[in-house]
């Protein structure tokens, strides 16, 4: 039984991390960026846009 319990969580953890899509990455920075763009316009949200790009890069996305 210990082998079964140890084997089950490992594959699901690695499977969940590998197929991370850009749309699902960095939800906090994405939400703040989008809200700012809608309310103030893109030209006033450069700092939030950059923060989201940095978060995406940290997760391995090439932006």
From Swiss-Prot:
Residues 1-21 are annotated as: Disordered. It is found in: Mitochondrion intermembrane space; Cytoplasm. Its main location: mitochondrion. The modification Phosphoserine is found at residue 14. One of its GO terms (molecular function) is copper chaperone activity. The modification N6-acetyllysine is found at residues 18, 30. The keyword Ligase does not apply. Coiled coil: none annotated. A motif (Cx9C motif 1) lies at residues 26-36. One of its GO terms (cellular component) is mitochondrial intermembrane space. A motif (Cx9C motif 2) lies at residues 45-55. Cu cation binds at residues 23-24. It comes from the Eukaryota. Pfam families: COX17. Keywords: Acetylation, Chaperone, Copper, Cytoplasm, Disulfide bond, Metal-binding, Mitochondrion, Phosphoprotein. Acetylation by KAT8 promotes assembly of the mitochondrial respiratory chain complex IV (CIV). GO terms for biological process: mitochondrial cytochrome c oxidase assembly; positive regulation of cell population proliferation. PANTHER family: CYTOCHROME C OXIDASE COPPER CHAPERONE. Belongs to the COX17 family. Copper metallochaperone essential for the assembly of the mitochondrial respiratory chain complex IV (CIV), also known as cytochrome c oxidase. Binds two copper ions and delivers them to the metallochaperone SCO1 which transports the copper ions to the Cu(A) site on the cytochrome c oxidase subunit II (MT-CO2/COX2). Interacts with COA1. Interacts with the chaperone CHCHD4; this is important for correct folding and the formation of disulfide bonds that stabilize the structure. This is Cytochrome c oxidase copper chaperone.
């Amino acid at each position: 039984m210990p082998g079964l319990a140890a084997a089950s969580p490992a594959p699901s953890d690695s499977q969940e991390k590998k197929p991370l899509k850009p749309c699902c990455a960095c939800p906090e920075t994405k939400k703040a960026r989008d809200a700012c763009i809608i309310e103030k316009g893109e030209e006033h949200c450069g700092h939030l846009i950059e923060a989201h790009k940095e978060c995406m890069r940290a997760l391995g996305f090439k932006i």
